[in-house]
Regions:
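Anaerobic metallocofactor- and corrinoid-dependent redox/one-carbon enzyme cores
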Residues: 2-12, 17, 25-29, 33, ...
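Long, compositionally biased, glycine/small-hydrophobic-enriched stretches that function as flexible linkers
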Residues: 2-190, 195-203, 207, 227, ...
Length: 521
């Protein structure tokens, strides 16, 4: 069976994956995800005609999220969701037709490129919107745009019209990141700077990976007083900085590095693993029985924790497995990829803007000469050590803002401070690009200049679709001279790439030395 997928950075050359996904996705799953996408387009068209419903928008968010890279590998789960979408579609408008899924990737090259970019960006935004929705937070414009975007996807547009839609979407995604920031901070408090150990203590433990704070909070509440420790993994690291989460003493530290190392790091580990979102890799038999998935995540053969009608989840099976495994007999001192034994997080916009006067004074005094935002997705492709070397080469009078799992390339390094300000400031998860934007806007206001005139350079790494929606937001805000790597998206046609280079001065990364020289002169 053949397939087509080119949505992630590791897609097979030259044009994408056609037999099996490099991510591990099979052709049947890839085709079912295309079928699901077409069903979502059909549902959106029905909602556009019959009127928006909360349940309908939830289906759109969840379905798009299910198609994000490394979220769901289960044929049964995807098929079940397609059936649910089609049943709801028929309930509200039995006459409406689904989009032909075989047409998803067909057409004139540049149009398909732009249309694909919108679809993939919407998949990324759906993840953010769904996390906010689970905490009871919505934005009316964001909800409406899930319908609009999918409806537009089935229409014919010129290249210019598609570009305009991409810029409109970028602004909508900014609203989406804002509502998720509000959901997280109003529910769990404003993140505070927190040092997180990489040591695993003796006794039973659960490693929580993904992005979902709501799931982690429920697990923490269910493990209170049970002698089971909790460790974050990957993009869950920033959870240590939220006051309402860190008040649980069993939230001990962070396990492992970024997602792509799990097939090595999870082997022979006597603990349970809970996947709340991506990135799950096909688990090895050595630890498959210790894997639990929930929400949109799925992998055949792994236990799945369903959400109950009241919105809660019972994680007792995960807890029981951790107790059964028993954990380590003695403390295990793990390190980051550079040998560090601890990392620091919690420098979201609430914290950084709280010391804005100190930062501004340091810039005016010449103590801080440049800011870099070095972050985004990590991945397995050779060449991602670029980001480690780039940060190592940043001058001592510069500050590195970082976010998402790309930070694991360097977040265990100690590169010093400037006047008490750490030179590496971890702003949080990938959605906390919102924090970086707020800091940039505040600095521009303080110095009475445009964001593009600040001594600030964005050096981004990408892997999956949340990086796509963030990039579109940055472009929609008019931010120029962004460096992106380790390779360019295969869904950018040569003409579309030329437009992005000419209009937005988008730069493919080269070498740390050459790029640093180009940036700083």
């Amino acid at each position: 069976m053949s397939m087509f997928c080119y949505q992630c950075e590791q897609s097979a050359a030259p044009g994408g994956c056609t037999v099996q996904g490099v991510c591990g996705k099979t052709a049947p799953v890839a085709n079912l995800q295309d079928e699901l996408t077409a069903a979502l387009v059909g549902l959106a068209r029905a909602l556009d005609v019959k009127g928006q419903t909360k349940e309908g928008v939830d289906y759109l968010m969840r379905g798009l999220f299910m198609c994000v890279t490394n979220v769901n590998f289960s044929e049964d789960r995807v098929q079940e969701f397609i059936d649910e979408v089609n049943a709801y579609h028929a309930k509200i408008d039995s006459a409406a037709q689904n989009f032909d899924w075989e047409q998803l990737w067909k057409g004139e090259e540049d149009i398909v490129s732009l249309r694909s970019t919108l679809l993939l960006g919407m998949r990324g935004m759906a993840a953010y919107a769904w996390h906010a929705a689970r905490l009871g937070f919505h934005d009316a414009d964001v909800d409406a745009w899930f319908i609009k975007g999918l409806v537009e996807f089935a229409k014919d547009h010129s290249a210019e019209e598609w570009l305009n839609l991409l810029m409109e979407f970028g602004q909508i995604n900014l609203k989406c990141m804002a509502v998720l920031d509000k959901a997280n901070t109003e529910t769990y408090g404003t993140p505070v700077p927190t040092t997180v150990p990489l040591t695993v203590e003796p006794g039973p433990f659960i490693v929580v990976t993904g992005h979902d704070l709501h799931d982690l909070n429920q697990l923490l509440e269910q493990t209170d007083g049970k002698g089971v420790n909790i460790y974050t993994h990957g993009e869950m690291l920033p959870c240590h900085a939220y006051p309402e989460l860190k008040k649980h003493p069993q939230l001990k530290g962070n396990f492992g590095t970024a997602w792509q190392n799990q097939q090595k790091e999870f082997v022979d580990v006597p603990g349970a693993f809970l996947f709340t979102t991506n990135c799950i890799m096909p688990p090895k038999e050595n630890y498959k029985a210790n894997i639990f998935t929930t929400d949109m995540v799925g992998f055949d053969g792994c236990a799945h924790v369903e959400e109950k009608a009241d919105g809660t989840k019972d994680f007792s099976a995960v807890i029981e497995r951790a107790i059964e495994l028993g954990g380590y007999k003695e403390a295990q001192e793990f390190t980051g990829i550079n040998g560090g034994h601890e990392v620091t997080t919690g420098f979201g916009h609430g914290t950084v803007l709280g010391i804005a006067d100190k930062v501004i004074d340091a810039v005016k005094a010449g103590a801080i000469k440049h800011f870099f935002l070095v972050g985004g997705c990590d991945g397995a492709k050779v060449g991602r050590n670029y980001y480690t070397e780039f940060v190592k080469q940043t001058p001592n009078d510069t500050v590195v803002l970082t976010l998402a799992c790309g930070k694991f390339r360097f977040n265990d390094m100690n590169i010093g401070e400037i006047g008490g300000i750490p030179r590496i400031l971890d702003m949080g998860q990938c959605n906390d690009a919102y924090s970086a934007i707020q800091v940039a806007v505040a600095l521009a206001g303080a110095f009475e200049c445009d964001v593009n005139d600040l001594p600030l350079t964005l050096v981004l790494s990408w892997y999956e679709q949340k990086a796509v929606c963030i990039l579109l937001t940055l472009l929609a805000l008019g931010i120029r001279n962004i460096y992106i790597g380790p390779s360019l998206p295969k869904f950018f046609s040569s003409n579309v790439l030329n437009i992005l280079v000419e209009k937005f001065q988008l730069h493919p990364i080269t070498t740390p030395e050459a790029d640093m020289k180009a940036i700083l002169g």
